[in-house]
């Protein structure tokens, strides 16, 4: 069975505004410091529609014309592995500014990128010659540095992300590893199929803030929650 949720135009408008805010916040290191441009490139590591994450590039496209690698219309017809390989090859040619995915998926993609650059299945010379000059130089410098430090090539050696976002319930398990791989700490988002995007971290990367216009929130105390677990017939007061 597929879990679905009706999204009205007003819900989509709110969602668009909030994901755009997340994009901007993901680049910030302090209040008032942001860095987003329409020429930025975004690695596509999201499940396509009908999954909720498939809305992200479509909604963002209504606000800013950021290029996804690979293009959304092509990515939706590819397997996970095919998207990774093509996205990486395109990123080497065009550079990369943003990355967003579920925590575990982002980790898998990151390891995949590392294996593609470190293993025998890396970029061929013919493909390398299609890359921008600064990317070729960056790759050569990265390989020299990694050989000197006796370590594998990591995504952070090739790409200097402006923003990195993760969502999902398992982010705590991967955020430190993802930071080590990319050299930037991912900003966590909280979202679901029914309410869409509900909260985000900010430049501190410590704690999340609710989007007040996404849903009508109700809260119960931890004490009442535990009481409800013990006695399902108990109806806790909400705030």
Describe the role of every protein-language-model region.
Residues 1, 27-31, 92-95:
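Short, solvent-exposed loop/edge-beta patches enriched in aromatic
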Residues 1-17:
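Conserved AMP-binding A3 loop
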Residues 2-3, 53-56, 110-112:
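Short, conserved acidic/polar surface loops in the N-terminal third of protein domains
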Residues 3-7, 33-34, 187, 209:
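Short, surface-exposed helix-loop/turn micro-motifs enriched in polar/charged residues
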Residues 12, 16-24, 43, 88, ...:
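Short, well-ordered alpha-helical packing segments
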Residues 19-69, 73-78:
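Conserved AMP-binding loop of ANL adenylate-forming enzymes
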Residues 59-239:
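Active-site glycine/GP-rich loop and adjacent strand/helix microenvironment
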């Amino acid at each position: 069975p597929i879990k679905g949720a009706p999204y009205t135009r007003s819900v989509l408008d709110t969602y668009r505004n909030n994901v755009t805010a997340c994009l901007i916040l993901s680049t910030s290191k302090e209040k008032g410091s942001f860095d987003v441009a329409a020429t930025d490139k975004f690695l596509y590591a999201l499940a396509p529609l009908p999954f909720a994450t498939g809305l992200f590039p479509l909604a963002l496209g209504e606000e800013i014309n950021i290029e996804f690698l690979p293009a959304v219309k092509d990515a939706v017809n590819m397997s996970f592995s095919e998207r990774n390989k093509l996205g990486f090859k395109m990123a080497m040619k065009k550079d990369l500014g943003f990355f967003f995915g579920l925590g575990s998926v982002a980790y898998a993609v990151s390891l995949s990128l590392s294996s593609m650059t470190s293993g025998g299945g890396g970029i061929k010379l013919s493909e390398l010659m299609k890359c921008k000059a600064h990317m070729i130089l960056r790759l050569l410098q990265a390989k020299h540095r990694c050989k000197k430090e006796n370590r594998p090539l990591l995504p952070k050696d090739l790409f200097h992300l402006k923003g990195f976002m993760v969502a999902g319930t398992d982010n705590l398990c991967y955020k430190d590893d993802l930071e080590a791989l990319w050299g930037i700490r991912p900003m966590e988002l909280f979202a679901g199929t029914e309410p869409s995007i509900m909260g985000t971290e900010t430049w501190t990367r410590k704690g999340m803030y609710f989007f007040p216009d996404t849903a009508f929130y109700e809260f119960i105390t931890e004490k009442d929650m535990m009481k409800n677990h013990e006695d399902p017939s108990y109806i806790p007061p909400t705030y």
